């Protein structure tokens, strides 16, 4: 009996030891996997590093590319497009002006009544219209007729105090956010469609002429006096209220910058210099590229798999279209190599662009003790119902690294513009303010991105110079900015002044 008991005890002890060994191996495996997660995070943090020295190199590279782009066509990754906007709004404008904002699957029509410096914008009305999918791939005539019909309906709703002055034609600012070769303030040929549009017979045509023909067909007596993109519109909107505005930056789904340049510094300009001595330059800075940019394997893979490999590298590192996707790629690697979410990679995590930047922002801003928002996004967006607090903290860390890098190199880009304009140093006895107008959903809604960008710019400038540089939100530049440019380039300006 005693032998049997001893035998049973030995068997039992062996079983316990075996179970303990399995548990130890599991813990070691788990510990090893977690170590791999931390190694991937550290590697990401190192590769995304933005020390001040590197950011200053990025800023200097931006300034060099700006000079090259102004010297001759094709000499720089920056197009440095001449906008033909040589008169920015001053606040003196008065009268009724319209704007049309076409940049996606919806377009807006807007009218403003301007009352000069005392009253500024007296009244403002707008309407938003969806474009039927079939018109995005139809003919040029069909699309512009549809837009002209909407304009006609909008004009018909003018109230008693919102009519143009007697014997004056209505004037329109046209924000057209597609690649255009501008040939004057009110003309430009379409280079190519983007954003789901594919209307072959518009390519190579003057989009203002196409709209004008459609307005004639639909009985709309209106003249396009300014063709602009949303960034130039934002600059105009900012300058209308503050004469110290020198540049505008869009940080949204995409990104771009425009600024006011001395006309004499634009060496590729062959026409007579404008009377104002100034010209707004549309930088198209999303295409900026430099060896100093902190690119990672995730950025390189994203670029290679994109519709435009090798192009828009800066935009792919800082804009709302791509930030969430970079985070997804990092999380996918952690899931694949270190089982971050369990033994199998969640199927939804394999889907490109499933994690949008607003989702990333929501997780990044989660201040709840158990990171409930992160848990909710994992479940609702990525189909991951269960996650530990430890895993959720890692996800917030990844969001922080990617957002901080984007914000810091955005600040370096802005510094590049400030340097080009010679506003990065203080001249003796001068304390001139320089205002940068910012717009776009990323800047407006992603608070941690915005705060990091502003802090980084201050650090790059130094306390004294930072006091003279102001970042200001300029809302709805693509709408009201276009109407203001229609006013500042009105055909009736000389009559009004005489």
UniProtKB/Swiss-Prot annotation:
UniProt-annotated binding residues for D-glucose: 194-195, 229-230, 256, 284, 315
Entries under Pfam families matching the protein: Hexokinase_1, Hexokinase_2
Gene3D superfamilies, per the entry: 3.30.420.40, 3.40.367.20
Region described as Hexokinase small subdomain: 90-228
CDD domains listed in its UniProt record: ASKHA_NBD_HK_plant
Root EC class: transferase
EC id: 2.7.1.1
Record keyword Lipid biosynthesis present: no
Single GO cellular component term: chloroplast outer membrane
Residues that span the membrane, as ranges: 4-24
Region (Hexokinase large subdomain): 229-476
InterPro entries for this protein: ATPase_NBD, Hexokinase, Hexokinase_C, Hexokinase_N
Molecular-function GO terms, alphabetical: ATP binding; D-glucose binding; fructokinase activity; glucokinase activity
Binding residue positions for ADP: 104-106, 253, 441
Keyword Nucleotide-binding: yes
GO biological process, one term: intracellular glucose homeostasis
Keywords of this entry: ATP-binding, Chloroplast, Glycolysis, Kinase, Membrane, Nucleotide-binding, Plastid, Plastid outer membrane, Transferase, Transmembrane, Transmembrane helix
Compartments where located: Plastid, Chloroplast outer membrane
Reaction it catalyzes: a D-hexose + ATP = a D-hexose 6-phosphate + ADP + H(+); D-fructose + ATP = D-fructose 6-phosphate + ADP + H(+); D-glucose + ATP = D-glucose 6-phosphate + ADP + H(+)
Superkingdom, taxonomy of origin: Eukaryota
Function summary: Fructose and glucose phosphorylating enzyme.
Protein name: Hexokinase-1
Organism: Spinacia oleracea
Lineage: Eukaryota, Viridiplantae, Streptophyta, Embryophyta, Tracheophyta
